Each structure stands twice: as structure tokens, then as C-alpha cells.
């Protein structure tokens, strides 16, 4: 089939240097999947923690399903990530290093299953963010100059 994007975490690319990416599955309830099919999810401010040898995604907001009954899910509950033991151990070792964290980058459907792309990230300082903004501005100006030159 392919991939159908549910949501992106643009803030992660702004606040972190992404060093490594990997794909993980999610343990979800039925009403959560229905809400995700409607595109009602928010990855901003979410992060991954390892507890008792298991990986959990915190602060992932999935809006309650509109047509759900009293057994609807909680919007901000912690959700378990499906990763291999070696992957969890390697990520946990990197998290213990100073300045590293794991953030979700995007969520998508892959062959009918919900997947999350997580990234091993190191926080950016304020001057790094300014430097990135300068690079984007100069790149934008360059592309506009080339575009106007091609029109002539």
C-alpha cells in the first residue's frame, strides 16, 4: 500500500538536532485509531521515556473519537511503543548521555498499522536556532534571485 501521513512534528526539527531515526509501532485502542484516521492527533511537546525496560510515549494528544461511547479513550494517556529489546537498550544508553532525548518526528499509517518515526535528538542552543534561520533566509533569497533571473 504505502504510507499515509497523520501528523508531523515540525517543532522537533526546530528545537533539536536529529542524529538518528527509527520506526516504532504503537499500542492503541480502537477509538484512538478511528481518531487518527480522522487526523486528530498532535505530536508537539511529546517525548519518549524508558520505564522497566519498556518504551512509552508521553504527551501524545489524540482527540477523543466523536462518535465513541462512554468507553472512549483518554486523550493524553501514555502509550507503549513497540520496539525490539536491543533497540530499547541502545536508545536507553544514549538517553543517559548528557543532552540526548528521544522525540517523535511524524506519525503515519503503513499497511494499515499506525507507526511513529522517532528520532534521537540533541537540544539546540539559541545561537544554533538563529544560525539555522539565517541559513534558511539566505537560501530563500538565493532561490528568489534565481527565479527572477530565469524570468528575464
Curated annotation (Swiss-Prot):
Gene3D superfamilies xref list: 2.40.280.10
Domain of life, per lineage: Bacteria
Biased composition (Basic and acidic residues): 129-140
Comp. bias regions, Polar residues: 141-152
GO biological process: trans-translation
Gene Ontology cellular component list: cytosol
Example of a GO MF term: RNA binding
Keywords assigned: Cytoplasm, RNA-binding
Keyword Disulfide bond: no
Subcellular location: Cytoplasm
InterPro entries: SmpB, SsrA-bd_prot, SsrA-bd_prot_CS
Pfam families for the chain: SmpB
Region (Disordered) residue spans: 129-152
Major location (coarse): cytoplasm
PANTHER family, alphabetized: SSRA-BINDING PROTEIN, TMRNA-BINDING COMPONENT OF TRANS-TRANSLATION TAGGING COMPLEX
Protein's job: Required for rescue of stalled ribosomes mediated by trans-translation. Binds to transfer-messenger RNA (tmRNA), required for stable association of tmRNA with ribosomes. tmRNA and SmpB together mimic tRNA shape, replacing the anticodon stem-loop with SmpB. tmRNA is encoded by the ssrA gene; the 2 termini fold to resemble tRNA(Ala) and it encodes a 'tag peptide', a short internal open reading frame. During trans-translation Ala-aminoacylated tmRNA acts like a tRNA, entering the A-site of stalled ribosomes, displacing the stalled mRNA.
Family membership noted in the UniProt record: Belongs to the SmpB family.
The protein's name in its UniProt record: SsrA-binding protein
Organism from which the protein derives: Pelobacter propionicus (strain DSM 2379 / NBRC 103807 / OttBd1)
